Structure formats: structure tokens, C-alpha cells
Amino acid sequence: MPLSYQHFRKLLLLDDEAGPLEEELPRLADEGLNRRVAEDLNLGNPNVSIPWTHKVGNFTGLYSSTVPVFNPEWQTPSFPDIHLQEDIVDRCKQFVGPLTVNENRRLKLIMPARFYPNVTKYLPLDKGIKPYYPEHVVNHYFQARHYLHTLWKAGILYKRESTHSASFCGSPYSWEQDLQHGRLVFQTSKRHGDKSFCPQSPGILPRSSVGPCIQSQLRKSRLGPQPPQGQLAGRPQGGSGSIRARVHPSPWGTVGVEPSGSGHTHICASSSSSCLHQSAVRKAAYSLISTSKGHSSSGRAVELHHFPPNSSRSQSQGSVPSCWWLQFRNSKPCSEYCLCHIVNLIDDWGPCAEHGEHRIRTPRTPARVTGGVFLVDKNPHNTTESRLVVDFSQFSRGNTRVSWPKFAVPNLQSLTNLLSSNLSWLSLDVSAAFYHLPLHPAAMPHLLVGSSGLSRYVARLSSNSRIINHQHGTMQDLHNSCSRNLYVSLMLLYKTYGRKLHLYSHPIILGFRKIPMGVGLSPFLLAQFTSAICSVVRRAFPHCLAFSYMDDVVLGAKSVQHLESLYAAVTNFLVSLGIHVNPHKTKRWGYSLNFMGYVIGSWGTLPQEHIRQKIKLCFRKLPVNRPIDWKVCQRIVGLLGFAAPFTQCGYPALMPLYACISAKQAFTFSPTYKAFLSQQYLNLYPVARQRSGLCQVFADATPTGWGLAIGHQRMRGTFVSPLPIHTAELLAACFARSRSGAKLIGTDNSVVLSRKYTSFPWLLGCAANWILRGTSFVYVPSALNPADDPSRGRLGLYRPLLRLPYRPTTGRTSLYADSPSVPSHLPDRVHFASPLHVAWRPP
């Protein structure tokens, strides 16, 4: 007869009427019993002939793809002018005095952040915007382009202007102005009106002087992977290949690719016409994909071009119509859905390309992308705004993958010890936290996004037209892309974007200037940044608490009035550093803080209500006696694992599920196992904070017997059959807890100390977790353990009781000013006659 739920509870000693613990508990370690129970509960039966279930409630498993929903009404979020102050370390020093080693190190990491991948794969521009929504191709294209344009305008992206130069908006940082190691000095060239531009201005080296000496010095600079000929050295006169031969090698780095004539005609001409000509010519050059536009000769790091406003006159007035969009103007309509009807709607479509306020030299940047982008809902609660997803997963795959740095996240117990108190809480919302952290320009060539332009994108996706060679578009090729769908989409988009349609239909390549979300380095850098800032705030206000996890910052103070004044002071401090706090999204929590999915109050920690609801729903939908695909099990375990520490039996109760997932087998829930789990998750017990105290109770065991020292009392017992040592130590700890009721037990076993009972026999792990819930352990070396003698059967010899103080841990979150120094990477040699055993002093 299969095991009933009541019987199973009795077996696990979850009921009160169980026999004496010293007899019952060792039985649960018996392998035979564990195997019989597993068979009864149908836990280890992988060979099932029934087809697997691939969906349970909202959890989908193998062979199912969730189709993302496209929203044509998505709003692009606005990004404030985010500019983290460069002298952030000095500002923190003014605020709190000298910084600790840890804070200094963390802030240096992000000013600027550097990124050195092992290998970078460059993808064609067609892969820039992912065809994630096949039904809404054009719509998605323009929304994504608009999002990218918004990011560029907000100073979050660089725009690639040529192989070696890029432009950007916003305030420049010092590393964007001087070349590495101060070799070449930064000069600003303000080009206003008709002022002619002096060819020999200081800091601009004439071509001949950029000689091999500087080339070789530059080659050693740490700007990441170098082009072979010295990163900023001018190419040999005349360039190489037919494309570059048309680039006139002028010493002052003019933009513009001219067929002939002298190099500085653009500069001396009036700005408006020069810009006009440049944009026309630049368009012509664009189709030749990789043109180096004379910039390789300029010796400056950044030229700050201030383009006058009147320069954005339309290019359609008499200049070369090399632009796909404007060519429709002069062509005959091919049908009633021809694009020329749209292009003829207005005369002035604006410029073909926009240029940033500042220009910067970059390492060689190919006209390619390294990751694709697509849009999704901003979050499950906000579907009106979109969020840009950037896929730079190439850096995390294959043999050349980058191993991202690890960083400490406080576990549940540390978090509770830290935040469970009678303080009042509020949480701050940092808007676009990732986009605060600046990246070194050398990383730009590795983090490129962009698009190939509307014509290529549409041609790529429409089955009836082949990809056209756009070097010389003939009229026939031009109309290949006309279709009813495109026409209707563009007419609707014209209402939204107006003449920007023209700008967005051009190809563009953008590199990140601030850290993007799709790279494994970003969470690490953000965590370092916010934890350093919180550390500074904690030291400035020692009677308050500030804590952060990624972009979630919480403040706690003794009273509400105190909290409000703290909030004002901290917000002003953050704003002075250039951090954007969104005051509308500040949440005041009262005494129970909602943080990282938990509710934390003075009584301890519990999961938030929405997680409890999800768990209830999960059990309601969970089928019995049907094999469930392991991918679904993985998602179920993800949800249940989060709340496991709040149940009686904890993680060990989920072990059968873990085992089937790692074997990639289907799992069948028997009615008893399902009833057991749902009962476990019905009543959740808070995880309380640990208190410091003196340890008075000690446990020890040998494979054959156990011993306890409770105050001045000694006890011992033997096991019916010898047990593995870790199992014996765990049993001894359970006996100590049940005999003495002490919350603090001394043990010399590291596995018991770690409180992870998942590797023990399943039934024992579940029972021990319940018995030892809320117990803290203190390490005591065997030589000094008072319970050592009783466990070996000797009751006569008394070792004096130790005075072992216990301090609860807050993980690696140091709340005190003296943060630990950085450990050296080479550990000191540990001698076998360890000082711990010889001259051991209580911690």
C-alpha cells in the first residue's frame, strides 16, 4: 500500500507523538528506508511511457516558445541628462572625509569602466535589429531606431562617424579628451561662422611628425586591441585601395571625402554650406561601407565641433541624391503603394545624418555590429513603455568567453541580521542605473549596435525581393522594396515620427559610451558602485542604515522625522554626484521593508505576498501522477527554492526534484509528495535574526556514538550501527537542540556548521532541517570541544567549558568604517601545525 501523507508526516517526526528522538532519528539515515520511501512516493522512477507534460500554470517547459507581444503604442522612455561627476572620489571625500581602501577601489573601477574581451565577433549590419516580431517588422525597426536615437541624444551611445572617429552628445569626460598617457594634447576647435581654421594650431601635429616613434609608443598604449599600424598614426599618403585613394590626406582631419581638390576648402567655406556638403558626401561614402574619412591624420583626441543650428537644411535642395529615401522623389510611382507617394508628402525631409556636439578619436571600429537589439515591455507592470534588450551574449559563449568577476550578494540570513530591526524604511529609485557608469572609449569597438538602414532591412525580410547591391541603386532596384505592407506601416509611422522617418531609414552604427545591460560585466560594476556609495553614506550618518543591491537603495532611521531628513540629505548628496534619483518612485515602507522579494521587519523575514500567491497558484495547477518535463520542474524549483528557507523542511524537501532535473528526466508528483510539499508551503515561518550570545551547549560524535555537554551536564549514547561521520555529527547536533532547547550550539563539523543538509539521506535532511531551524552554530576545534570525551564513551574526564562568544554575521557587508583590506591573491602558506589548533583564542 502506498505511503499516506499522515504516515509520511509521522515518519519525518513532524508530528508530536513520535518516540524518543535518540531512537527515531538515526532510523531516517538508513539507506534501505530512504529507498523504500522513494519507491513508495514514486520519486525515482525516470522511465515513464506516458508523454511528458510541458506546461503547468504559467510555467512552460521544453519545445514551447513564449511569443513576445509587440505593442505598436510603446512609448520610448526619456533619459535625463545623466552625467556622473568625474571627481566623484573628491566629492565623497568632502562629504565623509578620507575614503576606505574598499570604497576607493570600487569607485576607481567605474571611472571609467574598462572592458577587455578575448575575441570579438563582428556581425553584418542586417543583424543589428533582431526580427523578433515577424508581424511588425517595420514598426519594430522604427521604434528600435528611435530608442537608439534617444540613447545617443542622451549621451549614452557614441555614433560611429568613420573607422577612427565617433561623435556623441552630452558633457565630455577627461579620458575622452586626452589620448592615453598624455601623449597628444587635446585641442578644442570651435568652428563658428566663417572663421578660417589655422592649419598649424598647437597640438595638431603636421602629418610628417606623426612618425614611427609615436606610432610605436602608441602601439603600447592600453587602448585594447590595436590596428597594426599604430593606433592614431596617419596612413601612408594616398591611402590603400580604391576607396581610400579618394580620401584626401589633409593634415587637419577634415570630414568629407572629396574626389579631388585641396583638403581645407570645407573649413574655410561658410559653415552651413560646408555641413550640407559634408553630409551629402558622407552619405556617398557610406555606401562604400568602410571609408576612412581623413580623420586618421588628425592628432587630436577629440574635436569639439559645434554644428550651428542652421546647418540642418535639407539635402534635397540640389545636392547629390545618393540617399535611398530621397531617390524616390524623382522616380515614377510604380503602384498606388509606391513609397514615392510618402516621400513627396513634404519638401524638407531634414538631414540624412545628425552629428553629435563632440567628436572623439576611437580605436579602429569596423562598420559592423557585435550584438543585436530588440524591444520588450519595460516590466510586467508597465507595458506602455518599452525597454531595449541588447544581446551581447557572444562574450559569454564559446571557448573565448570572458569569465565575469564574481561579487558577494548577502544571503538570506545575513540580510535578516542586517536589516531586521525596528527602523523606519524607505527605498530610492535610481533611474536608468546602468547608464550612469561611463565606459572607456577603447571598449566602444566591442560593443556596437546599429542597423543596416530600412532598405536593406526590408529587402532582407521580404521573400519576393533579393538583396540588392546598393553600391549603385538603379530605379528598378529602388522599387523592389515597395509593398502595400510597407506603405501602410510608413503612413502610420509618419504620424508618429514625421520627417524623422528619413533620418531613421539610413544605416547607423552606435557604440556604448555607458555600460550596457547585456554584458556580464555590468551587474558587477553596478553592484560595486552602489555598495561603495552606500558605504560612504553609512559612514556619514553612523546612526542610520543605508544598503543597496544593484540599483535598489534602502535607507533606515529610528523615527519617521529622522528618516525624512536623512532622505533629503542623501538625495542631495546623490544628486551632487550626478546620480539621478526619481522622487516620484520613492517608496516609504514604515517598519516592514520590502526588499529583494522579501518583507523584512523586526520579527524577521518572509517572502513578499505576490510570491506566496504564485506558490499557491502553482500547487493548484500541479498535476498528480503525470510526468512533468524537467524544464518545467526547473521553473517550479526556482519558485519554491526562493521560499524554501521559510518552510519546516527547507531545501532538503526539494531534493527529489533537483535530482530529476540534473538527470534531465521527467518527474511525477505522487499525491503524498504533492500534499507534503503544499502543506510545507502553506504555513511559512519567518527567518529570525541571529542574536549574539555565549555558547553553553556542545555536541560531538564519532561514527559509533554521540556526546553532549550541556552546561555542566554530560551525556553520551551509541548508534545501533556505525554511521558516516557527517551523519553522526548532524544527529548529535539535533539531540543537543532537542535536549537543551539552546539556540546556540558548538560543533567541530564544518558540514553541520554550514547548515546545508541537502547531501544527507533525504528523510534525515528533512527532519534535521526542522529540528535545527533557527539554531546558530559556533565552530569549536576538536581539541577543545567539551563533548569530545563523552562521544568517545568517557564521562569521567571533564574539560572546562569554554566561554565561546558568538557574533552573528552580516556577510561581506561591512557596516563599520574599517572595511577589510583587499586579500592578496597568493594566500600565505598554511602550516599543518595550524596556529588555530595550537594557540587557539576565542574569536
Swiss-Prot record:
Mg(2+) binds at residues 429, 551-552. Activated by host HSP70 and HSP40 in vitro to be able to bind the epsilon loop of the pgRNA. Because deletion of the RNase H region renders the protein partly chaperone-independent, the chaperones may be needed indirectly to relieve occlusion of the RNA-binding site by this domain. Inhibited by several reverse-transcriptase inhibitors: Lamivudine, Adefovir and Entecavir. Residues 1-177 are annotated as: Terminal protein domain (TP). Residues 308-319 have a biased composition (Low complexity). Hepadnaviral virions contain probably just one P protein molecule per particle. Residues 357-600 form the Reverse transcriptase domain. Multifunctional enzyme that converts the viral RNA genome into dsDNA in viral cytoplasmic capsids. This enzyme displays a DNA polymerase activity that can copy either DNA or RNA templates, and a ribonuclease H (RNase H) activity that cleaves the RNA strand of RNA-DNA heteroduplexes in a partially processive 3'- to 5'-endonucleasic mode. Neo-synthesized pregenomic RNA (pgRNA) are encapsidated together with the P protein, and reverse-transcribed inside the nucleocapsid. The lineage of its organism: Viruses, Riboviria, Pararnavirae, Artverviricota, Revtraviricetes. This is Protein P. Terminal protein domain (TP) is hepadnavirus-specific. Spacer domain is highly variable and separates the TP and RT domains. Polymerase/reverse-transcriptase domain (RT) and ribonuclease H domain (RH) are similar to retrovirus reverse transcriptase/RNase H. It comes from the Viruses. It comes from Hepatitis B virus genotype B1 (isolate Japan/Yamagata-2/1998). GO terms for molecular function: DNA binding; DNA-directed DNA polymerase activity; metal ion binding; RNA-directed DNA polymerase activity; RNA-DNA hybrid ribonuclease activity. It catalyses: DNA(n) + a 2'-deoxyribonucleoside 5'-triphosphate = DNA(n+1) + diphosphate; Endonucleolytic cleavage to 5'-phosphomonoester. GO terms for biological process: DNA replication; symbiont-mediated suppression of host innate immune response. The record marks 63 as: Priming of reverse-transcription by covalently linking the first nucleotide of the (-)DNA. Belongs to the hepadnaviridae P protein family. Keywords: DNA replication, DNA-binding, DNA-directed DNA polymerase, Endonuclease, Host-virus interaction, Hydrolase, Inhibition of host innate immune response by virus, Inhibition of host RLR pathway by virus, Magnesium, Metal-binding, Multifunctional enzyme, Nuclease, Nucleotidyltransferase, RNA-directed DNA polymerase, Transferase, Viral immunoevasion. HAMAP family: HBV_DPOL. Residues 178-346 are annotated as: Spacer. Residues 220-258, 292-319 are annotated as: Disordered. Its EC number is 2.7.7.7, 2.7.7.49, 3.1.26.4.
